[in-house]
A protein has these predicted regions:
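Terminal targeting signals and extreme-terminal segments of soluble enzymes
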Residues: 1-144
């Protein structure tokens, strides 16, 4: 399979430029690198992403998963289209107290009107923390 990125879209550049002033920056999510069909990012496990018992909040993991899948999906469609979330699920399999978690989004299906992405989130030791799957709708980009 060749690179899935369309119309010269760069997932790294688009995500870094468009993420300012969003949940992405509030949670400290960073895009790290991209391959031909994957996007990788990380998020700190700290007071911004903890639940009351000092562990990584499951919702923060889902925010990381959705961020990665949405950016990757939008870069895998024509310039006049964007991707928006329709459904996301997550299984939280290991707690994390501090450090960083890393997510990698890879496509399961890239259709004309919808996409399905898998996102694996691991801790700094590479142990699985969360596995997520997201469905995106492919819609016309707003030009206003």
């Amino acid at each position: 399979m060749g690179a899935i990125w369309r119309d010269g879209k760069d997932p790294m550049g688009l995500g870094q430029a468009s993420g300012r002033g969003t949940l992405m920056t509030t949670l400290g999510i960073e895009l790290l690198d991209a391959g031909e069909d994957w996007l990788r990012g990380r998020m700190p496990v700290d007071e911004r992403t903890h639940q009351p018992f000092g562990l990584l909040h499951g919702g923060a993991s889902v925010a990381l998963a959705e961020t990665l899948a949405s950016w990757a999906g939008t870069c895998a469609v024509d310039a006049d289209k964007v991707c928006v979330g329709q459904e996301i699920n997550a299984n939280h399999v290991r707690p994390v107290r501090e450090g960083w978690v890393y997510g990698v989004a890879t496509p399961e299906a890239l259709g004309r009107t919808s996409q399905v992405w898998s996102i694996r989130i691991t801790d700094e030791a590479g142990k699985l923390v969360c596995i997520s799957r997201m469905t995106l709708a492919v819609v016309p980009a707003r030009r206003d």
